[in-house]
């Protein structure tokens, strides 16, 4: 199905005969299928000639010819065929193929998705299988698993698909032909065989032979396969920087197994055509041989026809050397190709392609902008074809029939058409307003073109039941579409006219496939959307926008399906009132316009009138809804991911609401669909999507039948549902959609209902009372239709004065009366609007976006009013039915827009401007819509970007903010990877405390100077010195305690951040730490030194004792750890204390070890004996000497020792220390020996550490 695009392109690309190539190039991809057929069939010689030329020495030219063709083809297929326009013939073929394949049929898409999931095959293969098996899933599965080789399309998956479809279509015109029909030398060989061969070639020798198949097709194959390959491989060529085109030639030469192979290796770059040359290369060798390839030509034909022989070969080659290349090509090309060529199969563009080629051309550019168009309709021979299939006049009936059931159910087709016409007009009108112009251009295209695709995407995402794309597209994909849609919307403005024409062309069909009608209009854009879809295929790999994707998946699916405000929901969080208002207004407008009331009488006339844009009700309905959608789309486009998905769902969800939904769903794609849905169906469809209930869909279908009027009555029931639904979807309700739906409901709801509804809406809106007010401002639009009136009432109700009006309005029947009431109501709204303004301001408050929109929209509103007036007059003139109502509406609208709307702009601030614009556009259903479009667009843009984006950003911000604070924690955490900050207190803190401890211990005064400065030495000596000092201060001297506490605590913080890693790697950070601590220890040392020990230790430590360090050092050196630990300690105990001062410098390390024990022993003896049990905590946290000092000393030891082997022992000892606790093995007795109490405990403790 998706293969067609590929095959068309592929075939054309590969017809290598130069003449053929030129023809193709000239004809463009459009004519490629025929040239292939001709060349393959009639021009067999030419093909071989072409192939031969390539082989013969025109390898480059052949190859290049293929390449140039390929490149073009590649661009067209892999990229969006930017430069090629489908010919009428191609379009027809595409239409036929698409219709045949039912590519747009949601059911087909679902099948494709299921098959892809079940068989884990590529979409191309799955589509091929479905095509072969008449869309029978079971047969297709069997076919895929048993008949179709795994790598059948590996090299040329995308195009191959095309081939099969083309062939199946007898579109052998695509050189590729069906891979199954590969036997078909003309198309099959060239294309089909080539195809098979292609995959084979990639895979292995046979592929080359298979290519031979291409060989006979040589030209054809070249055209088809080569084209395919060039398309697919062409990318590789480009990637590789050499003409992989050779590959194309390889396909073209087909005969040259080698070349084909070569192409594999890439060695055949350039040589593909010159099979011999390439053949010589490894690739040729790799392939069977050129000769085998030539021999295989026939085989290829046979294989293609039989598929199996080659399949076997293919399988071998796949696994063989070629296989890797195949993967490379397959991955890059397939991956990209999948995106661009045929990943998403959605009915979005399935609308009968009545759009003339000119429109297609417009589409083409659109698709050019979005490269996924060809992809979107992979089945079509060429990218243009997909457009054609969308555009084919025959399509409407067929597509309509197949999709109509779904689409009608989802969207009421009649009005969308009207909408298109209206949109046309409104586009013009909107153009008058700057905001409108931008919105209209973007909106309309979005509504039609992107929406068709995007809408389907969204529907698929949000209403998988209804949408074909539901299974196909992921949230990311939908986002991607949205992005594309957004991009396309500008391009699509040009398309709008043609779209409108299209929609006018087949109103009836339109009714059946209103969605498609829009899509027809949108078909131009749909291709774009489709292309986008094509891009969609790699959902996870290539998110269009990473940020938006989450919104789509979460918001769209989560909110969209359930609530209109999927997009708005986030907005709601952020006080999404702006999008809501925008949506609300738009929807309100649209709902009111959904004008089931007007539509009933005007709908069909409107369709005819739609062209005139005169049947305001329908037109307005469509326009308004569409405009709203468009506006919402445009705005929402800003949040394409969420908006798109939401829009699709929302659009579908509400038809009257739909406008709202569309509005709220700012997704352009959705919009097109939404627009259709917007029409009366929209409410039903919208509700349907919202509730996602078939009954709604059915109702929608019914609505489609009723043309728009039922929409009202359905709207009524739907509205009721919708109202309640929107209420449940308060955010959405908050969003225009819900509210709008409610408004529509309001219409639906009787007067009291209306009042209540309005309050419901208010309730729904309650965020949205302003929203309701916005609705009020929209009300004028609502005034246009009874629904509008009701909406107005609803809004009015939210508006203070409107209650009576609401009652009147509540009968949506009283359009004129309602308008009259509404006009006052609007005035009330106007009066109220300040209130609304206020409320909306509240909403606006969500995001000043709303207010800004308001302000911006005030101008817009005024402009809207101006336009409105114009619209009103125009509308009044145009529609008698509308006229009375509209005239009132127009006047009301104008006034409302001016005052109320402006008020509303402010008042319905959520998207007050949106509201205002919306209102304005609402006031005249037809014109109002345009205004709505404009206003909504602007408002929506603000609201969407502001509200939608802002909510996201705040979401991010909070994360970031915590992140920033926690960034330090990550510092801690980072260092705390080993230890959390909390833990840092413990183990690392334990070490950290060591730092602290050294600080507080501060290496005894002398040491502090030396060791303090030298972290390493200092830490070592510091340990000893500090330990002694610390222990005494802890037990005896508060100064030490304070030092420990102060230095330890503060230092701990730094150490955590700075030194935790250092703790682990003390050496690095440690030095800094000691330096930090020692200054503090300087003071503390004095106190600790003097106070610390029982005078003997202190004095010994301070000077005489430690001077002995050299002695200890000797011992230490002589006796590494054990000596220092045991023997040294004893010596160290006595001597170290005495010598410590003298030997502090160099002796510290050795004596430090033993003496640390001694000194530490003393320290520990006081505090640590009891404290040492808790040693681990003390290291970190212990407030007293143990925490600071002990910890510090061991840490210091670590710092010092890491260089010295004993350090390791020390580490062990630390553990042991903990284990040993008071009874340090060696230090204990030794330290005691020196200073019984002090040393005794301390040594044991420190020994444990040391």
Swiss-Prot record:
UniProt subcellular location? Cytoplasm
Q: Where is the composition biased (Low complexity)?
A: 74-87, 346-390, 507-529, 662-686, 752-821, 834-874, 887-949, 1029-1039
Q: Name one GO biological process term.
A: copulation
* InterPro entries associated with the record: TC-DDR_regulator (IPR051833), UBA-like_sf (IPR009060), UBAP2/Lig (IPR022166)
Keyword terms: Behavior, Cytoplasm, Phosphoprotein
Q: Which CDD domains match?
A: UBA_UBP2_like (cd14277)
Extent of Polar residues compositional bias? 335-345, 650-661, 687-751, 822-833, 1105-1141, 1182-1194
User: Which residues are in the UBA domain?
Assistant: 107-147
- Stretches the record annotates as Disordered: 1-89, 156-400, 507-549, 586-613, 650-951, 1024-1048, 1087-1152, 1168-1199, 1216-1250
Question: In its keyword annotation, does this UniProt entry include GTP-binding?
Answer: no
Task: List all Basic and acidic residues biased stretches.
Answer: 227-258, 287-300
What GO cellular component is one of the record's annotations?
cytoplasm
Top-level taxon: Eukaryota
Biased composition range(s): Gly residues: 183-195, 211-226, 259-277
Relate the protein's function as given in its record: Acts in the nervous system to mediate the control of copulatory organs during courtship.
Spell out the protein name for this chain. Answer: Protein lingerer
- What is the source species? Aedes aegypti
Q: What is the lineage of its organism?
A: Eukaryota, Metazoa, Ecdysozoa, Arthropoda, Hexapoda
């Amino acid at each position: 199905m998706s293969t067609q695009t590929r095959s068309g392109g592929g075939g054309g690309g590969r017809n290598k005969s130069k003449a053929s190539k030129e023809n193709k190039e000239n004809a463009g991809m459009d004519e490629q299928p025929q040239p292939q057929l001709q060349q393959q069939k009639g021009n067999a010689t030419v093909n071989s000639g072409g192939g031969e030329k390539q082989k013969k020495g025109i390898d480059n030219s052949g190859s290049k010819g293929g390449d140039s063709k390929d490149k073009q083809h590649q661009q067209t297929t892999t990229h969006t065929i930017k430069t090629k326009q489908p010919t009428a013939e191609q379009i027809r073929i595409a239409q036929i193929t698409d219709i045949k394949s039912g590519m747009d049929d949601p059911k087909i898409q679902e099948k494709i998705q299921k098959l892809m999931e079940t068989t884990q095959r590529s979409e191309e293969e799955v589509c091929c299988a479905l095509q072969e098996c008449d869309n029978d899933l079971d047969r297709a599965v069997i076919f895929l698993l048993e008949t179709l080789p795994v790598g059948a399309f590996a090299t040329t998956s995308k195009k191959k698909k095309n081939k099969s479809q083309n062939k199946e279509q007898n579109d052998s015109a695509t050189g590729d032909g069906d891979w199954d029909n590969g036997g078909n030398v003309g198309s099959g060989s060239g294309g089909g065989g080539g195809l098979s061969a292609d995959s084979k070639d990639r895979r292995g020798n046979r592929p080359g032979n298979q290519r031979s198949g291409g060989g006979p097709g040589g030209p054809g194959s070249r055209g088809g396969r080569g084209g395919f390959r060039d398309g697919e491989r062409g990318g590789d060529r480009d990637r590789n920087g050499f003409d992989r085109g050779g590959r194309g030639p390889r396909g073209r030469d087909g005969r040259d197994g080698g070349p084909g192979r070569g192409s594999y290796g890439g060695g055949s770059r350039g040589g593909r055509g010159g099979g011999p040359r390439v053949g010589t290369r490894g690739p040729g060798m790799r392939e069977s041989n050129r000769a085998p390839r030539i021999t295989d030509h026939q085989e290829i034909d046979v294989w293609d026809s039989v598929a199996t022989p080659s399949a076997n070969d293919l399988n071998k080659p796949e696994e063989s050397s070629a296989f890797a290349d195949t993967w490379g090509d397959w991955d890059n090309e397939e991956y990209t190709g999948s995106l661009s060529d045929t990943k998403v199969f959605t009915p979005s563009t399935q609308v009968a392609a009545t759009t003339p080629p000119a429109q297609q051309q417009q589409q083409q550019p659109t698709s050019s902008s979005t490269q996924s168009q060809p992809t979107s309709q992979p089945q079509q021979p060429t990218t243009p074809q997909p457009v054609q299939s969308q555009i084919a006049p025959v399509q409407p009936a067929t597509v309509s029939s197949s999709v109509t059931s779904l689409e009608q159910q989802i969207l009421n087709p009649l009005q969308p058409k009207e909408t298109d016409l209206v949109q046309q007009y409104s586009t013009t009108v909107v153009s008058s307003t700057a905001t409108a112009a931008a919105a209209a251009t973007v909106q309309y295209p979005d509504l039609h073109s992107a929406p068709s695709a995007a809408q389907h995407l969204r529907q698929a995402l949000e209403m998988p039941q209804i949408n074909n794309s539901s299974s196909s597209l992921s949230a990311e994909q939908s986002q991607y579409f949205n992005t594309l849609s957004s991009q396309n919307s500008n391009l699509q403005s040009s398309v709008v006219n043609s779209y409108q024409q299209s929609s006018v062309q087949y109103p009836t069909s339109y009714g059946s496939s209103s969605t498609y009608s829009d899509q027809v209009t949108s078909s131009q854009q749909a291709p774009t959307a489709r292309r986008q879809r094509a891009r969609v295929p790699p959902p996870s790999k290539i998110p269009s926008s990473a940020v938006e994707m989450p919104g789509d998946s979460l918001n769209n699916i989560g909110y969209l399906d359930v609530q209109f405000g999927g997009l708005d929901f986030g907005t709601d969080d952020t006080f999404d009132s702006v999008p809501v208002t925008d949506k609300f207004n738009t929807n309100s407008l649209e709902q009111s316009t959904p004008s089931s009331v007007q539509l009933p009488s005007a709908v069909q006339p409107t369709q005819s009138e739609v062209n005139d844009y005169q049947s305001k009700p329908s037109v307005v309905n469509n326009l308004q809804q569409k405009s709203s959608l468009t506006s919402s789309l445009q705005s929402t486009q800003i949040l394409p991911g969420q908006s798109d998905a939401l829009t699709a769902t929302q659009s579908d969800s509400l038809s009257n609401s739909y406008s709202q939904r569309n509005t709220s769903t700012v997704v352009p794609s959705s919009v097109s669909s939404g627009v259709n849905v917007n029409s009366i169906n929209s409410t039903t469809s919208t509700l349907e999507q919202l509730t996602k209930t078939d009954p709604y869909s059915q109702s929608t279908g019914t609505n489609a039948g009723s043309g728009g009027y039922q929409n009202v009555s359905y709207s009524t029931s739907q509205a009721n549902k919708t109202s309640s639904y929107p209420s449940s979807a308060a955010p959405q309700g908050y969003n225009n959609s819900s509210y709008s739906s409610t408004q529509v409901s309001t219409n639906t709801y009787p007067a009291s209902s209306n009042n209540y509804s309005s309050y419901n809406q208010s309730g729904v809106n309650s965020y949205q009372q302003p929203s309701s007010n916005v609705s009020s401002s929209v009300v004028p639009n609502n005034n246009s239709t009874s629904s509008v009136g009701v909406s107005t009432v609803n809004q009015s109700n939210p508006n203070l004065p409107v209650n009576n009006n609401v009652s009147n309005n509540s009968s949506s029947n009283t359009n004129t009366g309602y308008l009259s009431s509404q006009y006052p109501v609007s005035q009330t709204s106007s009066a109220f609007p300040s209130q609304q303004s206020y409320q909306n301001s509240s909403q606006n408050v969500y995001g000043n976006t709303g207010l800004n929109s308001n302000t911006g929209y005030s101008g817009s509103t005024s402009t809207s009013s101006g336009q409105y007036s114009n619209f009103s007059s125009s509308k009044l003139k145009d529609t008698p039915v509308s006229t009375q109502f509209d005239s009132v509406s127009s006047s009301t609208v104008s006034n409302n827009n001016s005052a109320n709307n402006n008020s509303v702009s402010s008042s319905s601030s959520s998207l007050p401007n949106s509201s205002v614009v919306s209102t304005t556009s609402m006031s005249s259903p037809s014109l109002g819509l345009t205004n709505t479009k404009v206003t909504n667009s602007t408002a929506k843009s603000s609201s969407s970007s502001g509200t939608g984006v802002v909510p996201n950003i705040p979401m991010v911000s909070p994360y970031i903010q915590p992140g920033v604070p926690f960034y330090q924690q990550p510092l801690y955490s980072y260092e705390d990877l080993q230890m959390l900050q909390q833990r840092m207190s413990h183990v690392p803190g334990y070490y950290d405390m060591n730092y602290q401890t050294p600080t507080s211990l501060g290496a005894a005064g002398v040491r502090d100077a030396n060791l303090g400065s030298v972290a390493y030495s200092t830490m070592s000596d510091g340990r000893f010195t500090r330990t002694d000092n610390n222990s005494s201060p802890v037990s005896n001297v508060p100064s030490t305690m304070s030092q420990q506490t102060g230095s330890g605590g503060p230092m701990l913080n730094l150490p955590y951040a700075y030194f935790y890693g250092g703790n682990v790697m003390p050496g690095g950070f440690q030095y800094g730490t000691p330096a930090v601590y020692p200054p503090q220890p300087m003071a503390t040392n004095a106190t600790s030194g003097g106070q610390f020990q029982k005078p003997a230790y202190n004095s010994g430590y301070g000077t005489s004792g430690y001077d002995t360090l050299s002695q200890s050092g000797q011992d230490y050196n002589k006796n590494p750890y054990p000596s220092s630990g045991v023997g040294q300690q004893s010596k160290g105990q006595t001597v170290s204390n005495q010598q410590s001062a003298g030997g502090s410098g160099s002796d510290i390390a050795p004596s430090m070890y033993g003496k640390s024990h001694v000194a530490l022993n003393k320290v520990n003896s006081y505090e640590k004996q009891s404290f040492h049990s808790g040693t681990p905590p003390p290291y970190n946290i212990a407030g007293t000497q143990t925490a600071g000092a002990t910890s510090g000393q061991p840490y210091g030891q670590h710092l010092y020792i890491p260089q010295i082997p004993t350090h390791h022992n020390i580490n062990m000892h630390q553990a042991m220390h903990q284990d040993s606790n008071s009874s340090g093995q060696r230090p204990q007795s030794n330290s005691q020996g020196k200073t019984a109490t002090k040393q005794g405990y301390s040594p044991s403790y420190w020994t444990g550490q040391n």
